[in-house]
Amino acid sequence: MTQKSFPITPEFLAAANVTAEQYVEQYQQSIASPEATDAFWAKQAELIDWIKKPTKISDVSYDLEDFRIKWFEDGELNISVNCLDRHVKNNPYKPAIIWEGDHPSLHKIISFKELHEAVCRLGNAMRKLGVKKGDRVTLYMPMIPEAVVAMLACTRIGAVHSVVFGGFSTQSLGNRIIDSQSKLVITADEGIRGNKRTPLKANVDRALDMDGTDSVSNVIVVHRTGNSVPMSGRRDIWYHSLVDGESQYCEPEVMNAEDPLFLLYTSGSTGKPKGVLHTTGGYITYALSTFRDVFDVKDDDVYWCTADVGWVTGHTYATYAPLANGTTTVMFEGVPEYPTWARIGHIIDKHQITVLYTAPTAIRAMMKEGDTFVRESDRSSLRLLGTVGEPINPEAWDWYYHIVGGGKCPVVDTWWQTETGGIMLAPIPGTVAMKPGAVMNPLYGIIPEVIDTDGVALEGAAEGNLVINGSWPGQMRTIYKDHARFLETYFTEYPGYYFTGDGVQRDEDGHYWITGRVDDVLNVSGHRLGTAEIESAIVAHPATAEAAVVGMPHDIRGIGICAFVILKSSETATESLKAELNRHVRTEIGPIANLDAIYMVNVLPKTRSGKIMRRILRSLAAGQYVGLGDLSTLADSSVINELVEVVKTERAK
């Protein structure tokens, strides 16, 4: 765990929204008592335009016999009004969305007024198709403006959207439609990313051939590429012909704060999909307040969260929070490497982006290609960088800070989950010097605890399981149609707490470091080692670009350490390099971190959101090459054969 820290530049501090002293004072006030926490969230709720202001702030019990999570329960509002109408009144022609297409020649700027009209037209059309408050609508779309229009149109009329990432398979899509019993599907003819097409409409057709999808009465299809797709006469409707004749105003549905807002399915490693349910008032309050705090938001910011709308980050921090705040949000259809790795920098310059929020996977991928592509752009418009999705190793953090940000932009390393609705731990910029790889501090109203396996809360510098003491407005309310699974997963192991499933270290300064999933903590000879810590040590070696570490059976140590390593393109895999890597890790962490197996590979098995599927690597490390479980969420299933060959060859030596 590095203790190197980087102070915030004086220029940034001078303009920061919050000082270190203010953070400490406000944080302590926000957690002083349950009444103080309610008072804090009542104040944050004033950022929202309510139809009926809430008088009851929270009603929460983690007692399994009397369980409830309710926030602002007597309040009424409509989220689309908060994202659109109030800005149309004050600043109608401000860009709401800057859309950058897959090809660099394509871009579109959509004002709040134009977005409002598009949302109202689709909302009216959906009502005419019989979609009512509480009905589920599945979106299976590329990163085009109509995806955001569809999300907001659902909120306009009180429908519950379930966005399925456009890269998911027919089977995954079908399972989510069946579980949600959606009435309507909105899709496009095809998606296009990196000049490669995805047959979205054809996938929808195949998904709707599955048993249990009879709930779907219509499919709305956006014309994106223009390639011919089969259209079923009664069921399928072209988006543009549907909305063209509709009114530019749609009466917003009055929603109770605890009415469902959206479902978002997380892929468990096995079993049926897990539908995370978020509700209306608490979610938007938490999204907006954390957005303003973590990103030090200014009125003239051009903000780019690179997440696809199919993921929770794309919901909260690419769509709802920026639009609710009246901030211009950038939406990118393509991939960082098309047409070259310089694309991200060129987009930053083209649209004068001020805040960039992206994932360590993308940062490491760019870093692997070297600095030249990044230096093709100026990037002087940037003032703040963010990272999300997984722990960032200090080397990638360092490269992001110095090369992408030029050493002048604070990096906010954020920890949160689909389940939490918004960011929970992050260094609010201007309040604390940054430590590469640390998520640093809790946000207001959030009380993290470090708990050992016996359920004892640890004080001071400690390592253990991360739990949250108490509730917060953005918290998920249930797993759709499976409340028992919700209680069992998050509230049973450590009674009275929300169990995150993540491991954490708290250092001597009281700052937090996420060590990876609890099942990614290795117990080696009775010593606990976080895989993130070992991976960081490996990637600190100049020859390596990326690494994934898993446990493997070991005759002596019980659990051994197995590393899958991607080298930089200029390096060659040799036995001497393996030995050097092992020496390096032992030096960085200690002899206990001896690497028992090192596999030099070209690729790692990743989901479409960029997360490494470690259970596959665990099976391979144990010599199991078949029966690897559900591979439907893999971005590229062909990598499995390649990995199997590498492991077999090495184990045969």
Swiss-Prot record:
Signal peptide: none annotated. Keywords: Acetylation, ATP-binding, Ligase, Magnesium, Metal-binding, Nucleotide-binding. Its cofactor is Mg(2+). The modification N6-acetyllysine is found at K611. It catalyses: acetate + ATP + CoA = acetyl-CoA + AMP + diphosphate. It comes from the Bacteria. Acetylated. Deacetylation by the SIR2-homolog deacetylase activates the enzyme. The keyword Secreted does not apply. ATP binds at G389, E390, P391, D413, T414, W415, W416, Q417, T418, D502, R517, R528. Mg(2+) binds at V539, H541. One of its GO terms (molecular function) is ATP binding. Its EC number is 6.2.1.1. It is an enzyme of class 6 (ligase). CoA binds at R193, G194, N195, K196, T313, S525, R586. GO terms for biological process: acetyl-CoA biosynthetic process from acetate. GO terms for cellular component: cytosol. The keyword Transmembrane does not apply. InterPro entries: Ac_CoA_lig, ACAS_N, AMP-bd_C, AMP-bd_C_sf, AMP-binding_CS, AMP-dep_synth/lig_dom, ANL_N_sf. Catalyzes the conversion of acetate into acetyl-CoA (AcCoA), an essential intermediate at the junction of anabolic and catabolic pathways. AcsA undergoes a two-step reaction. In the first half reaction, AcsA combines acetate with ATP to form acetyl-adenylate (AcAMP) intermediate. In the second half reaction, it can then transfer the acetyl group from AcAMP to the sulfhydryl group of CoA, forming the product AcCoA. Belongs to the ATP-dependent AMP-binding enzyme family. This is Acetyl-coenzyme A synthetase. The lineage of its organism: Bacteria, Pseudomonadati, Pseudomonadota, Gammaproteobacteria, Moraxellales.
